[in-house]
């Protein structure tokens, strides 16, 4: 979805290696010249190699670059901008992760998005309450001029957001032309996606719908770390965010 939102992207960055499948999928775009994947734990790359060949591009594609560093520290030390930044950190109850869902982080990360670029933020809707989940949405709502919310799993969400950078801030349609390329089609088939319309059907909300509610909702901040304070509790009580499930 991120690649099809910004089909002309040349430079991309991803926060969080995980299994390597997201990086592999992004590298399916033949228009992308470089993808930097930032992972704080080097052992994740060791584990990810067990998933070959379905993530081969991460380790074998010359356009792929793995950086072992804290995401905030990495961005603070570079002078570069990316056509998109995809943030797929661990679950918010993992120590330190909640700081990647704050107003301050979104303020900072915007500096590294090229004009016309986007941020794609993944967050899960399981083991988290509606109240806490909406603190993340409210933080992002404060800092981005437009965004779309896609339901990408039974309880997983991808928020694709555009900052107000002087360029037209409205998000355009997903690009069917890029999806038609051989590697992208193959990647789609692995995920059970045969057509862009299937991805468009995952769209459940946008800023116009959510802003009136989020404008008055508490936002997750460094000084008011609602997510850090409540994520472990929500996990313990097996909380589940239900509000967005009603948006179809």
PLM segments and residue spans:
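Soluble small-group transferase modules, centered on the S-adenosyl donor enzyme superfamily
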Residues: 1-14, 56, 70-79, 98, ...
């Amino acid at each position: 979805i991120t690649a099809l939102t910004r089909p002309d992207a040349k430079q991309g960055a991803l926060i969080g290696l995980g299994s390597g499948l997201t990086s592999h999928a992004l590298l399916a775009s033949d228009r992308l010249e470089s993808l930097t994947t930032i992972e704080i734990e080097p052992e994740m790359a060791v584990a990810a190699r067990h998933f070959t060949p379905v993530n081969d591009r991460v380790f074998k594609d010359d356009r792929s670059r793995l950086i072992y560093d804290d995401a905030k520290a990495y961005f603070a030390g570079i002078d570069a901008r990316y056509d998109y930044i995809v943030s797929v950190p661990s679950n918010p109850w993992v120590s330190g992760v909640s700081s990647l869902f704050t107003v301050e982080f979104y303020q900072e990360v915007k500096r590294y998005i090229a004009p016309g670029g986007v941020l794609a933020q993944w967050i899960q809707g399981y083991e988290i309450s509606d109240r806490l989940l909406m603190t993340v949405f409210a933080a992002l709502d404060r800092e981005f001029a437009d965004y779309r919310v896609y339901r990408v799993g039974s309880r997983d969400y991808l928020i694709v957001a555009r900052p107000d950078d002087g360029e037209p801030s409205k998000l355009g349609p997903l690009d069917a032309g890029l999806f038609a390329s051989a590697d992208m089609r193959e990647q789609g088939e692995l995920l059970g996606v045969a057509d862009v319309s299937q991805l468009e059907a995952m769209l459940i909300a946008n800023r116009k719908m959510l802003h009136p509610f989020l404008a008055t909702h508490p936002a997750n901040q460094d000084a008011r770390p609602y997510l850090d304070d409540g994520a472990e509790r929500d996990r313990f009580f097996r909380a589940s965010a239900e509000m967005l499930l009603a948006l179809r």
